[in-house]
């Protein structure tokens, strides 16, 4: 930020951030701002956001709080269902795995597409990544497990030390079966993790290492 931008920000009472998840580093910076900062949750179909999460101050929370006119529920797969009649005529079925709390607030755990089914245990990649930042969790096909949890890391040569650390902090069924070092984590044009490319890259690397598996 240049000085002019900082001064302009100080004069702002409320700042709303949308368009994607807010990472931990940004949240840390935001926490020091005098401005009230909120993260929004919404979809293209809802035209605008339908819930807010306070990122700083005494009211900071990991939970999103929906607007009064919005009703939320979960599908059988724990994906979020949105009923927002003021902005959308139809009930919306999302691909976001969520948890709804008794006070009506909710947390987004990750995308349905990013659930790894490893030996019958369903593992949310985004939840593991919160514990393992800056590493990325993906999966590769596995004859016994169906999908094997795989950790991708960039420019980290000591995989043995990392493996030992993972053994300490993760339950057995969450521990990555493979730890792969790559030059850089594939990203989309808007800077998000390219999940599809990560899966392809991990599979190709393992086929190179173990061509007969």
Question: Model features per residue range: what roles?
Answer:
Residues 116, 150-152, 165-213:
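Conserved C-terminal "lid"/linker of ANL adenylate-forming enzymes
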Residues 97-174:
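AMP-binding/adenylate-forming catalytic core of the ANL superfamily
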Residues 81, 107-109, 188, 194:
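Generic structural signal for well-ordered beta-strand positions
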């Amino acid at each position: 930020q240049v000085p002019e931008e900082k001064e302009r920000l100080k004069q702002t009472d409320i700042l709303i951030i949308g368009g994607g998840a807010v990472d931990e580093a940004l949240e840390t910076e935001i926490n020091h701002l005098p401005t009230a900062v909120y993260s929004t949750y919404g979809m293209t179909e809802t035209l605008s956001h339908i819930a807010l999460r306070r990122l700083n101050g005494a009211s900071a929370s990991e939970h999103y709080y929906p607007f009064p006119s919005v009703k939320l529920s979960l599908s059988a797969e724990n994906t979020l269902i949105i009923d927002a009649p003021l902005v959308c005529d139809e009930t919306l079925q999302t691909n976001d795995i969520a948890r709804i709390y008794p006070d009506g607030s909710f947390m987004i755990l990750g995308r349905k597409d990013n659930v790894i089914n490893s030996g019958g245990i369903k593992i949310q990649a985004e939840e593991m990544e919160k514990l393992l930042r800056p590493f990325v969790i993906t999966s590769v096909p596995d004859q016994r497990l169906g999908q094997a949890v795989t950790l991708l890391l960039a420019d980290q040569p000591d995989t043995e030390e990392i493996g030992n650390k993972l053994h300490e902090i993760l339950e057995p069924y969450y521990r990555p079966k493979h730890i792969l070092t790559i030059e850089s984590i594939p990203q989309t044009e808007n800077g998000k993790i390219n999940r599809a490319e990560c899966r392809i890259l991990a599979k190709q690397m393992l086929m190179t290492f173990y061509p007969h598996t």
